[in-house]
A protein has these predicted regions:
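N-terminal secretory signal peptides that target proteins for export/translocation
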Residues: 1-14
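Bacterial N-terminal signal peptides
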Residues: 14-27
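Structural preference for beta-rich elements and adjacent junctions enriched in aromatics
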Residues: 27, 31-180
Length: 180
């Protein structure tokens, strides 16, 4: 199902995301010994900030997600590390296809949107499909542009009842007025 960017824009710019950037700057500070290999097995992940409460955004119902997702966040001098554990019973078919870079990912995926400056003027969107397809873009009030190609890293892996996506977004990926 195609992503509804209008819904995302409305949600993204409903309020400034200064809290999100502040979170990244104050989150689990670690020395980067994380290998982006699609497996969250490094000791740093055990001490990462953990988020587990998510709602359905496609379709945009706001209801509690049907299957649990765990997101771990670590901030280092090199950037932000994000690890997703996406639980999905083996009995439920996964959409696990590879798509070209920046093509619409019509598969199971994780999306991270960050307003690095906390101004609600520009957000950076990073999407990883379950087969490690990547899509990124810039979100501004009323617009989404996939013309931007940031340098960031991801890898995914899959088990019977869950799949991982592991992401590293370097601080240098976007201009910031207050870089860490």
């Amino acid at each position: 199902m195609p992503c509804s960017y209008k819904a995302m824009l409305k949600t993204l710019f409903a309020a400034p995301l200064t809290g999100l950037l502040g979170y990244f700057l104050l989150s689990s500070q670690a020395q980067a010994a994380i290998s982006i290999d699609g497996v969250l097995d490094e000791p740093e992940w055990a001490g990462a900030e953990l988020y587990t409460e998510f709602v359905t955004v496609e379709p945009l119902t706001g209801e509690q997600a049907k299957y649990p997702t765990e997101v771990r966040l670590i901030s280092t001098a090199e950037g932000i590390f994000i690890g997703f554990t996406n639980y999905q019973p083996a009995s439920i078919k996964r959409v696990n296809r590879q798509f070209p870079r920046d093509a619409e990912i019509e598969a199971d995926r994780n999306v991270v949107s960050i307003d690095f400056d906390g101004t609600a003027l520009a957000g950076y969107d990073f999407t990883v499909g379950s087969a490690n397809s990547q899509q990124d873009g810039i979100v501004t009030p009323g617009n989404y542009s996939a013309d931007w190609d940031g340098i960031w890293y991801s890898q995914t892996s899959s088990e019977a009842d869950y799949w991982y996506s592991e992401i590293h977004i370097p601080w240098t990926v976007a201009p910031m007025t207050n870089s860490p």
